[in-house]
Regions:
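Bacterial Sec-dependent N-terminal signal peptides
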Residues: 1-23
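N-terminal "domain-start" segment that seeds a small globular fold
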Residues: 18-41, 125-126
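Short, internal strand/loop/helix patches
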Residues: 24-25, 97-146
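Amphipathic alpha-helical repeat scaffolds
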Residues: 32, 52-56
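Conserved helix-turn-beta segment immediately C-terminal to the redox Cys motif
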Residues: 46-47, 56, 60-84, 104-107
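Thiol-based oxidoreductase modules, predominantly thioredoxin-like and allied folds used
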Residues: 77-94, 110-121
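Thiol-/selenol-based redox modules, centered on thioredoxin-like
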Residues: 129, 133-181
């Protein structure tokens, strides 16, 4: 009887750990760049490209390509979410308001921008912890290497892949994924 109780307890605790580990992209709430709460569950049924961005980086011109990608595919259940972060070389020093003005004025950004967060280190945002840790996303460890690293999330909220910061938003990997090829 003790053996059965032990096995049952072990089984139930394993199930609890697995559900806690892979709670899914859609379970997170984030803050928009203008301070509103946004539930990622609103994106169920859409492919999502998550990208950490910075205004004073050599890769900042990717904003233009990201906007072009968004314009091309936004009517095909695709969305981009930008997360400003100041983790690399202090290249995103501005306030949320300053970042929003910069993106709109210089690149015409209309894809959703979120409030500035940390994408690595001790103060990493919960969403980025999930994006970067296999134990949580169930797929792969993918530490953010620099500004403009991209994560691909499918319609069900499952982690699909990541794309290195220097790769174009129009890389074959991203476009093929969006188009379902």
């Amino acid at each position: 009887m003790k053996k059965i109780m032990f096995l049952a307890a072990a089984f139930l605790s394993t199930i609890g750990c697995l559900s806690a580990q892979n709670s899914g992209f859609h379970s997170f709430n984030v803050t928009t760049i203008d301070g509103n709460n946004f539930s990622l569950s609103a994106l169920k049924g859409k492919k999502v490209l998550v990208v950490n961005v910075a205004s004073k980086c050599g890769l900042t011109p990717q904003y233009k390509q990201l906007q072009e990608l968004y314009d091309k595919y936004k009517d095909q259940n695709f969305v981009i979410i930008g997360f400003p972060a100041n983790n690399f070389g202090a290249q995103e020093p501005g306030t949320n308001e300053e970042i929003q003005v910069f993106c709109s004025t210089n690149y015409g950004v209309t894809f959703p921008m979120m409030a500035k967060i940390s994408v690595k280190g001790d103060d990493i945002a919960p969403l980025y912890k999930w994006l970067t840790e296999k134990a949580l996303n169930g797929k792969q460890d993918a530490e953010v290497q620099w500004n403009f690293q991209k994560f691909l999330i499918d319609e069900k909220g499952d982690w699909v892949d990541f794309v290195a910061p220097g790769e174009s938003p129009f890389s074959e990997k991203i476009v093929s994924w969006i188009e379902g090829k």
